[in-house]
Structures are given as C-alpha cells and as structure tokens.
A protein has these predicted regions:
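ATP-binding pocket architecture of kinase catalytic cores
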Residues: 22-149, 156, 160-167, 185-186
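Short amphipathic alpha-helical segments and their helix-coil junctions
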Residues: 188-191, 233-255
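A general structural signal marking secondary-structure boundaries and capping sites
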Residues: 5-8, 101, 105-109, 132, ...
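Juxta-kinase regulatory segment immediately upstream of eukaryotic protein kinase catalytic domains
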Residues: 1-21
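Hydrophobic core segments within long, regular secondary-structure runs in both alpha-
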Residues: 151-155, 229-234, 290-297
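Helical subdomain adjoining the active site within ATP-dependent kinase catalytic cores
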Residues: 245-317
Length: 317
C-alpha cells in the first residue's frame, strides 16, 4: 500500500467521500473514504466484507482497498458514473451486467461456503419480531404485523426452493443501480460495495437484481419481462455465444430466479424492520417493510405455481 499524506479538497459522493491526497513524490491522487453507517453491524458482517474485498479486487471487481480504520475504509477512486434504474434494462448494459455477474460468481473466496440466505433471513426474523418502538405511531403499525404469518411464509418458501438445486456462488446480494458504475468513455462497468456479499444461491442474486428494476419508487410493474430475462440469462450462461443457450437451460434459470425473487422480498422486508429501529436515517423503513411484504404476497401464487409445475414435469423434458 502506498503512503499518502496531506488532505486537500474533499467532496461527498453517494458511496463515500472523494478526497484528494498528495503522495510522497508530490503527485495528487483521488481516493474514496467510506464511512460505515451507525448501527449497520446489526445487518452487515464487516469482517466478511473486508475479506471478500481483497479477493474481489484481485479478480478485477470494485475499487482497490487501500486501508481500513475503526468505522470505515479507504479505497481507490473509480472514475465512473452511478447507473440509474432505467439504465439496467438497456439491452447492451443488461448483457454486460450479466457477463460480469457470471464472472463475479466464479470468484473463489476462502472460508465458509454455505449459502447464507436462510441463515440471514431467520437471524433478521428473530431480531425483527421482538422490537419495541418509542414512537407510538410506529409501534401501532408494527403491531399490525403477523409474525406468525411471516414465519410461515419463510418456512414454505425455504422448503420450495430446497428442491430447485440452485448453484451456490459467491453472490453480491445487493446489485441495485447504486452499486453499478459505468465509465461511458471506456465503456467499462464496475460492481461496487460488497458489504452484503456472501456465498448464496445464484437465483437469489439474479432475482434480487431484477427486483431492483423497480427503482427508488419501488414500481414493481417495471420487473423485467420474460423476454428481457431471457436476454440476460443468455449472456450470463454463455457470454461468448449467447444465442446457443438451450431453451431447457433458459427455462430452468427462469424458474430458479423467479422463485428466489420472492426470497429477496422477504429478506429486505425483515431487514427494513431492523432498520426502522436502528437506523438514524430519515426514511420510512416500516412502510418499506409493508411494500416489500405485500409485493411478496402479490407475486407468491404465480411464482409458487411456476416452481411447482416445473418440479412436477417429467424428468426427460
């Protein structure tokens, strides 16, 4: 790691602070200083994040890790713009995201390789179901939640997905537009912010990404169509020859993705309840819980039927 000293101008960015520093040889460079949010340790494993960053950086993903301190880290600066939600569905960009995601999923991170989805969901559930709010209106809304029902939904979905034999990969788990950057001049795409990264089910990572097509307004009518999904799948499964992907492989990944998409809604719904209690950010996290959980219930019947029909098919199909 290079020694740097002296801080010049700094500018707050969406993913941290851009800081100009002068090296010992007099050269001025830009770096990014990321500060962890208060109470984020309740939902993020920082030790796991730091371990992953080193290996992912070596594989060409994200910014280089330059140093760590008590409540944050220093990384190299990426000269690129953050994508918008509409950017992600543009065919050329969707294909590039798919190709990069395949490569991301091939990175080997040492350590515990068990998928973390259901461990995390049940951990979140345990915390989310025992909260108390000082704000009486928040407490009233919170008490309208049937955690018995939520737990039953988690158990049913976990059982269904267990039959899909989804590959376990090192997953980003939070591939929204804000964690994708593009250098338009070089046409280079970057994945950033691996704080939720872990070994997980492939379909969860892709389904979670598709949920983010809804954008910051959470308009789930923008969820990608089957045609858009197949375009993504072709470039994910066969980056060099996407048109040669078989219909069988496309349908298998379609079922896998759209079943685990439901798990994405449950994951972030329970996460939101913890944030409603712990986060100092002025955001309606309770409202976000209901938004995600209601979307889960809206999509559940069709997605369960899709998976059950697929699993019941003759094995030679």
């Amino acid at each position: 790691m290079q020694t740097v000293f002296g801080c010049g101008e700094s500018e707050e960015k969406e993913n941290g602070f851009e800081v100009s520093v002068r090296e010992e040889d007099g050269n001025l460079i830009n770096i990014t200083v990321r500060l962890y949010g208060p109470n984020t340790e309740y939902v993020i494993d920082r030790e796991r994040e730091l371990q992953a960053i080193g290996y992912l950086s070596a594989a060409g993903f994200g910014a280089k890790l330059l140093g760590v301190f008590g409540n944050g880290m220093v990384q190299s600066f990426i000269y690129a713009r953050t994508l918008t939600p509409p950017d992600m569905r543009k065919p050329k960009l969707a294909a590039e995201i798919a190709k990069q995601l395949r490569r991301f999923h091939q990175v080997e991170i040492p350590g515990f390789r068990e998928p973390q989805l259901w461990n995390e969901v049940f951990k979140f559930f345990k915390k989310a179901s025992t909260l108390k709010f000082d704000d009486s209106e928040k407490q009233r809304k919170y008490e309208t939640i049937s955690f018995e029902e939520v737990e039953a939904e988690v158990v049913k979905l976990k059982e269904l997905t267990s039959h899909l034999a989804a590959p376990v990969v090192f997953a980003h788990n939070d591939l929204l537009s804000g964690n994708l950057m593009l250098n338009d001049v070089e046409e280079k795409l970057y994945f950033i912010d691996f704080e939720y990264g872990s070994y997980n089910y492939r379909g969860f990572d892709i389904g979670n990404h598709f949920n983010e097509y809804a954008g910051y307004d959470c308009d789930y009518s923008l969820y990608p169509s089957k045609v858009e999904q197949f375009h993504f799948f072709r470039h994910y499964l066969e980056p060099e020859k996407p048109l040669e992907v078989s219909d069988k492989d496309l349908q298998a990944l379609y079922v896998e993705t759209n079943t685990y998409m439901l798990a994405s809604h449950l994951y972030w719904a329970l996460w939101a309840l913890i944030q409603a209690k712990m986060s100092p950010i002025d955001f309606d996290y309770l409202g976000y819980f209901f938004l995600r959980y209601n979307e889960y219930k809206k999509q559940k019947e069709n997605c369960f039927l899709l998976a059950q029909s697929y699993l019941a098919r003759p094995l030679n199909e």
